[in-house]
């Protein structure tokens, strides 16, 4: 019997439309990771060592298919120029370390804010996406808002660059013109397919066993 495909291989298969029909579970859970590490949030989010260790411990605890190396709300805590902030720099370095230490065990996913939330707009998003791809992420997720009112050439450029790295680019809302990522509520999980995130960034006090159940359910 063939061995099950690794999370990295499952993500890569999405590029060819050859997904296995099961969910690739990626919880938004940095605050929980900080609690697992027993770290203060402000230090955790700006320290690449704490961030990498916390996300690795989170993966050990809940066995997800993917780890979100950055989240929009966390990146924006440092301002709208996300690559120059302490949070952005910490996330990039943590990505490099996780890439080296975790191999194919989990897919590394960069969840980035939509262009309307960034000082440099679409150009800022393009540069951020390129930086995280160079650091080693396996997928990009753009979590925009209603102000992101249409697809652009730059988003197509970003998706093409990501494809060169064998990384899919997905996002919400649909107006971004990207393949959709599924957002599943933590308190109402259901089997899903493709890349699947918790609907929101989970609070620090989230129960680890309940999150493990969420992962198992959306994976199907």
Give each language-model segment a name:
Residues 1-75, 155-168, 190-220:
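N-terminal basic, low-complexity leaders that serve as flexible interaction/assembly modules and, when applicable
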Residues 37-51, 109, 117-127, 181-188:
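Active-site mouth loops of central-metabolism enzymes
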Residues 53, 76-135:
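Active-site-proximal, glycine-rich beta->alpha crossover segments in alpha/beta enzymes
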Residues 90-96, 148-156:
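Active-site-adjacent beta->alpha loops and helix N-cap segments on the catalytic face
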Residues 102-108, 160-181:
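Short beta-strand/loop segments at the ligand-binding rim of alpha/beta enzyme cores
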Residues 120-142, 147, 155-160, 164:
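Alpha/beta enzyme core
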